Amino acid sequence: TLGGAVVAICLYHSLNPFLSLLISIVCGFLAGIITGVLHTKLRIPKLLSGIITMTALFSINMFIMGFGSKGNTSGYASNVYLNGKNTNGVVIKTIYDTFLGFFSAKNYNIIFINILLVVVVLAIIYFFFGTEIGMSVRSTGMNEAMSRAQGINTSLMIILGLGISNALIAMSGALYTQVNRTANNTMGVGVLVIGLASIIIGEAIFGKRSFKNWILSVTFGAVIYYLVICLALKLGLPDYCKKLLYALLITIVLVIPLVKKAISKNKNKRKGDLLGN
C-alpha cells in the first residue's frame, strides 16, 4: 500500500511515472530498514517488528494519500483516484501509457511492460545475490548463527534483506496502482496469502534445486496461481467463492509433494521386489 500511495501522489503532482516508481521503491526500502532496525537494534521479535511497522504505515499511508485528494482539508484520505488531471491540468499518465504508440490495445502495453520489468528485476536479483554481499544476505537467512560465526555482520544483512524485500513489495504496489489508476488503504489485504501460495506452487511443481531454479519457480508459481484464479472466474465461478478457491488450490499444491513422494516410494519398492525375485 505504501508504494501505491506514494506513486499515486507523485503522479498527481505531475512527476514522471518512472521517477514516481523509483521514489516508491525507495520509500519501501526505508520501511524495510525500519523493520530491520526494530528487530536487530531494539531486540523486538521478528513478527512483532513487522506488525509494528505495518500498523504505523496504515496511518502514514492515509496521511500521504491526503495530498492527492482534491478539496481535502482533513489532511488524510483512504484512497486516491488517477482518472483525472494532475496539478498542471494535464491528464495523468502512467508507465503503461509509454508504449501506447507500439500497441493499439492497452492490455498489450500492460503485459509487455510487466514482462520487461519482471525480466529486469529477476536479472538484478540473480546478479546481486551472486555477489559477496548477496551471498552474505542469503547465508544469514539460511543460518544466522553460522553466518555470525563466519564473521558476517548478520544485523546489517537482516536490515539489508528486509529493505530489498520491502522495496520489491512497494514496487508491486506502485505498479498495481498504475494499472488500476487508484490507490486505497486496503489494497494490500490478502497479498501475503497470495505470495505464500505462489511460492508453494512454484516449489511443488518446479522444485528448488538451485538458486536460479528457485527464483524462476517463485515467478512461474505466481503466474500459475493467477491463471488458475482467472480461469475459474472466466468459467463463471462467483466472485465470493474466490477465497474458497484459494484454500482448495493451496491444499492441492501442498498435497502434490506428498503424492510425488508416495509414487517414488512405490516405484522403488517395486524395483526392489523385482530385483529380489
Q: Which residues are covered by each model-predicted region?
A:
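Helix-loop-helix "hairpin" substructures at the membrane interface of multi-pass membrane proteins
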Residues: N16, N107-M187, L192
